[in-house]
Amino acid sequence: MKHPFPQFPPILVIYCFCMLQIPSSGASPPLAGPPDGLDAVDPERLAHFLNQRETCSNQPKESRDVYKRFLFHYSRAWKSTHPVNSEFAPVHPLMRLAAKLPSRRMKRLPRLLHTDSRMATIDFPKKDPTTSLGRPFFLFRPRNGRYTDKVQ
């Protein structure tokens, strides 16, 4: 089997010789038009492209300015139109209403149990201290099963 490597250099030399353009006068003639497959660059299109590129480079600065305006508009540094109550911590308004729920519940319960209503009166049994095994009554369970007083 013959190796293709010894034949490779002569083929390369022939290919390069065929592709070489030897001008007769010693200087190559200037191109009359753009080579095939390449478009000539229009100066107006080039200026438009460069202008767009410049505006894209300024875009982070503009977005930074918009962000600063947003922060300035929504910051509490300026004087607000509504007076801010300083005794309350800044919490959601519904959380402020949650503190008023037990008192509203207690006001509504006697109305429901009123004798004029058609509902039957409900007697709530009172807790005696023996049923709670000496533990105080908690609205919520103590964390991790711990008791407030050391009862074991």
From Swiss-Prot:
Gene Ontology molecular function terms on file: G protein-coupled receptor binding
Any GO BP annotation: locomotor rhythm
Domain of life: Eukaryota
Stated induction or repression of this protein's expression: Expression has a diurnal peak under light/dark cycling, but remains stable under constant darkness.
Residues modified to Asparagine amide: N144
Keywords from the named record: Amidation, Cleavage on pair of basic residues, Neuropeptide, Secreted, Signal
Principal place of residence: secreted
Tissue-by-tissue expression: Expressed in the CNS, spleen and testis. Specifically expressed in the suprachiasmatic nuclei (SCN) of the hypothalamus.
Family (UniProt): Belongs to the NmU family.
Function in brief: Implicated in the regulation of circadian rhythms through autocrine and/or paracrine actions. Stimulates the contraction of rectum and elevation of blood pressure.
Protein name according to UniProt: Neuromedin-S
Species of the source: Rattus norvegicus
